[in-house]
């Protein structure tokens, strides 16, 4: 059975371009006139860019990159023009990536929390020729370039607010490149043949690496332009007249943040950009800029629910909707937030780097708590059971297979390894277990169960760690949680949880009492195979990949 998007959003708002770079597509926009209105605002300094400034900075950066690297937009293979960006969120992060595209190159996005070994490995995989980074990461990145035998002149500074105030000697900065571009000739337009945007890679994006190995997903220009159009169509904003103000806290070094940012600019929304996530600073931004839309992850929602004092730090009355991605948003968490903020629309979604990035999202047209919404237009989905047979019914879980114009070109690896990402008919094998259910209004909704490799069998019963994690996060004394299966002589497997205690709730409880409280909390709603008993370990932090997902293979080493 092939599942598709609802009938009311089956057609895209406009045709997917076949010969356009993603940056040019976003800068042209959806037809909404923005004039001098700020589209990008630095939360720390108030510095802003309107559409004209953005276009000018991309143009001048491209001129300088062409001179510095000696590249011509229409000569040489894009694979030989890979430039990396390893930085926290900077005003020029995305404009820089678009300038790289304009000289015929590919942008490798690298997370700023990556180790030197990780950076070295990914840059070597990509044959990266140069790297832009922020001041805090200069020592690490200098060592990486030296290990890769790249000249120090191939390291550049992408300024953050603090960087712009320093007088210390630094590598050539983006600001200097833009200034130099004023006196340089224009860059020829990249000449894409009809249909070439489907194959030309725009970004190399590391996957989440929750199993310990990061692959580089090849995301093409058409992948992203498709996903932008898919998102605005389902979201119902394709024909709206009033742009919104959005909170920009997602890391631009991750596909979720990168595509969400591009979508907002395409719609001519204003993005209030934070270099790093800081809850009090984010809340102050909401009050100062009257922010209406928040792009967040479930951990942020859980923090708000479990720490009501946060609602008193700022006036949040402007907020209208939360787009929640990266992990499923449980029905319990939705209910808890609705009790304190009933006027907020919680729009849960599902995506993955390999789909660049959104696959489904909840629309205001059809809300089904606990689901990750409806499939985006032009997305097709199948569910395959453990026996390899295709599932034909609702409410039956199976591995999720996808087809969409936003699906990546493939991994940057040998064909033999890459072939495991797709089946014989070209469907992406996600590795996620999911089901479809019909909501009260009769619309199909997608539910994510867990990663296939993470599901354990307790006394022959399938137990999804995500279900236990969801319940744990609803305990007021739990800030973070990660669950996986361990061997058990009697049951085959049993769940084991790593828990980060709240620093604000039940701080006086000793570990034994808190462990019992958590166990009772689990017992209230989950059956015996899901119980943790004494399988709880308290830790200061949970190691995470660059997508924010727990690195469970590292936790298993701590038992």
From Swiss-Prot:
Coiled coil: none
Database matches in InterPro entries: AMP-bd_C, AMP-bd_C_sf, AMP-dep_synth/lig_dom, ANL_N_sf
SS bonds (residue pairs): none
One MF term in the entry's GO annotations: CoA-ligase activity
Annotated metabolic or biological route of this protein: Antifungal biosynthesis
Region ranges (SBD1): 278-348
Enzyme Commission code: 6.2.1.-
Residues with glycosylation annotation: 30, 223
UniProt note: domains: Both substrate-binding domains (SBD1 and SBD2) are involved in the substrate recognition, and are sufficient to confer the substrate specificity.
Similarity comment text for this entry: Belongs to the ATP-dependent AMP-binding enzyme family.
Name this polypeptide is given: Fatty-acyl-AMP ligase ecdI
Organism, scientific name: Aspergillus rugulosus (Emericella rugulosa)
Lineage: Eukaryota, Fungi, Dikarya, Ascomycota, Pezizomycotina
């Amino acid at each position: 059975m092939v599942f598709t998007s609802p009938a009311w959003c089956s057609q895209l708002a406009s045709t997917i371009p076949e010969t356009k770079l993603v940056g040019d597509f976003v800068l042209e926009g959806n037809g909404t006139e923005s004039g001098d209105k700020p589209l990008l605002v630095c939360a720390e300094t108030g510095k802003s860019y309107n559409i004209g400034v953005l276009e000018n900075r991309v143009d001048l950066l491209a001129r300088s990159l062409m001179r510095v690297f000696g590249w011509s937009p229409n000569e040489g293979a894009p694979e030989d023009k890979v430039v990396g960006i390893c930085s926290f969120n900077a005003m020029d992060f995305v404009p820089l990536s678009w300038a790289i595209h304009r000289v015929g190159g590919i942008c490798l996005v690298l997370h700023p929390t990556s180790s030197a070994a990780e950076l070295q490995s990914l840059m070597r995989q990509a044959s990266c020729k140069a790297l832009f980074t922020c001041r805090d990461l200069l020592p690490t990145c200098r060592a990486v370039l030296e290990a890769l035998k790249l000249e120090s002149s191939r390291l550049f500074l992408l300024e953050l607010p603090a960087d712009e105030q320093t007088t210390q000697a630094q590598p050539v900065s983006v600001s200097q490149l833009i200034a130099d571009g004023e006196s340089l000739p224009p860059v020829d337009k990249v000449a894409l043949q009809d249909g070439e945007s489907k194959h030309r890679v725009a970004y190399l994006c590391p996957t989440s690496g929750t199993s310990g190995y990061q692959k580089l997903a090849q995301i093409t220009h058409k992948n992203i332009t498709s996903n932008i159009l898919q998102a605005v169509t389902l979201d119902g904003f394709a024909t709206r007249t009033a742009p919104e103000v959005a909170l920009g806290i997602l890391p631009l070094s991750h596909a979720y943040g990168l595509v969400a940012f591009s979508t907002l600019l395409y719609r001519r929304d204003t993005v209030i950009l934070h270099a790093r996530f800081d809850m009090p600073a984010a809340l102050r931004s909401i009050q100062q800029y009257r922010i209406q839309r928040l792009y967040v992850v479930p951990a942020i929602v859980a923090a708000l629910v479990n720490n009501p004092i946060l609602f008193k730090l700022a006036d949040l009355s402007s907020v209208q909707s939360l787009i929640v991605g990266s992990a499923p948003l449980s029905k319990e968490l939705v209910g808890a937030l609705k009790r304190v903020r009933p006027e907020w629309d919680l729009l849960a979604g599902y995506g993955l780097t390999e789909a660049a990035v959104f696959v489904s999202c909840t629309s205001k047209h059809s809300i089904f708590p606990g689901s990750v919404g409806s499939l985006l237009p032009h997305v097709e989905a199948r569910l395959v059971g453990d026996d390899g047979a295709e599932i034909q019914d609702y409410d039956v879980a199976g591995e999720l297979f996808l087809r969409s114009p936003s699906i990546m070109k493939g991994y940057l690896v040998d064909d033999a390894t890459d072939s495991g990402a797709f089946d014989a008919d070209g469907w992406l094998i996600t590795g996620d277990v999911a089901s479809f259910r019909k909501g009260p209004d009769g619309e199909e909704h997608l539910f994510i169960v867990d990663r296939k490799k993470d599901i354990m069998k307790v006394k022959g019963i399938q137990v999804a760690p995500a279900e236990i994690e969801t319940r744990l996060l609803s305990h007021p004394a739990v800030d973070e949680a990660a669950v996986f299966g361990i061997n058990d002589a009697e049951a085959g497997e049993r769940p084991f949880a790593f828990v980060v205690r709240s620093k604000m709730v039940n701080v006086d409880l000793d570990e034994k009492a808190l462990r019992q409280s958590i166990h009772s909390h689990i017992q209230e709603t989950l059956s015996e195979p899901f119980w943790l008993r004494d399988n709880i370990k308290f830790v200061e932090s949970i190691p995470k990949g660059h997508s924010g997902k727990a690195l469970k293979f590292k936790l298993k080493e701590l038992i």
